């Protein structure tokens, strides 16, 4: 195999790895928003606090996806 073919294979594998790596944050976001809606439906008076905590959790989960994206670009 020449160097160009190896570079293409490595690029394809990193994209596949990133695709698999985004499954966790995607599932995490779905659970996060679902539970936030459920909590707001149960206690509407706490919606402000629930929303604040939800946005903090959103940032933490999104960081995982961004780290996976950067790792895929580096490799």
UniProtKB/Swiss-Prot annotation:
UniProt keyword list: ATP synthesis, Cell membrane, CF(0), Hydrogen ion transport, Ion transport, Lipid-binding, Membrane, Transmembrane, Transmembrane helix, Transport
Transmembrane segments: 13-33, 55-75
Lineage top rank: taxon: Bacteria
Sites annotated Reversibly protonated during proton transport: 62
GO MF entries: lipid binding; proton-transporting ATP synthase activity, rotational mechanism
Keyword NADP: no
Biological role stated in the UniProt entry: F(1)F(0) ATP synthase produces ATP from ADP in the presence of a proton or sodium gradient. F-type ATPases consist of two structural domains, F(1) containing the extramembraneous catalytic core and F(0) containing the membrane proton channel, linked together by a central stalk and a peripheral stalk. During catalysis, ATP synthesis in the catalytic domain of F(1) is coupled via a rotary mechanism of the central stalk subunits to proton translocation. Key component of the F(0) channel; it plays a direct role in translocation across the membrane. A homomeric c-ring of between 10-14 subunits forms the central stalk rotor element with the F(1) delta and epsilon subunits.
Protein family membership: Belongs to the ATPase C chain family.
HAMAP family: ATP_synth_c_bact
NCBIfam families xrefs: ATP_synt_c (TIGR01260)
Name of the protein: ATP synthase subunit c
Organism: Bifidobacterium longum (strain NCC 2705)
Gene: atpE
